[in-house]
Each structure stands twice: as structure tokens, then as C-alpha cells.
Amino acid sequence: MLYILNEIICIFYNFLITKMASAEFFQDISGIIKNNEERLSYGISVTDFNKDGQFEFIVTGFRHPNLALSYKKGFLENLINEEIFSDDIRSTIGVAACDIDNDGFEELYFLNTDTYSGRKQYSDRLLDSQTKIIDLFEIEKNLNL
């Protein structure tokens, strides 16, 4: 019985490997991104950060601007150019979207790294989009957290 089970597993494994090698899981759509320059981007999240009813791809920029890409007339283009969001002097490597203040809209947490050890020069960001984009970490009551 064990021998038969082992044979079945080997056949199934070989079938999967063969099919996976020939499958096209991803498609290169980089041609539809407007102003698509070479850059380092290590993180992505999907949310409706600007509250327009459409999801944006929030793309981190490692020493490049963070982007909020959304479809406009068949192309992906950056919708947010505010300095506090773009933040190209920081080295952003991760992003997460979550409604932390329970207002029904997601905030963005940007993980920044500018050193491999020791104290960071630039802090992370926790951005909220109200009438303008603000960093909740920079509000006075949160400065010593």
C-alpha cells in the first residue's frame, strides 16, 4: 500500500511540475503604466486611499517616490503627488493598508529603512487621507510613542 501511495505521489508531483512549467501565470503589463521609470519597489498594497470608489495599487519606492497607481483610460497612472505620500527621500520597503481608527477608510503604514542596524534616521509613516494627507505619527500626542 505504501509503495502504491508513493508512486501516486510521484506521478502527481511530476504532473504538477510539467504543467506549472508550461503555465503562464503572469503577464507583463508594464507597458500600460504611465511614466514607468526604472526603480526599486519592494512592497505593494491595494486600497481606495483617495476615497474615489476605485482601488489604487500603492507601490513603495526605495529611494524613489511611493506611487498610487489607478486605471485611467486603459492606463495605470499615479494619482497622488503630495510630498508626504511620495516621500522619495525615505527608503520604503513595505506598505500595509488597514482601518486603524475605525472611520471606515483604510490608513497606510509605510515601513521605511535607511540603516541596517541602529537607530533609523527616518521614521515609518502612518498616513491618513482626510481633507489632506497627514502622518498620524507626527501628531503631537503620538510623538513620544
Task: Describe these PLM feature segments.
Residues 20-145:
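Beta-propeller-forming repeat regions
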Residues 15-19:
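Short hydrophobic alpha-helical membrane-anchoring segments
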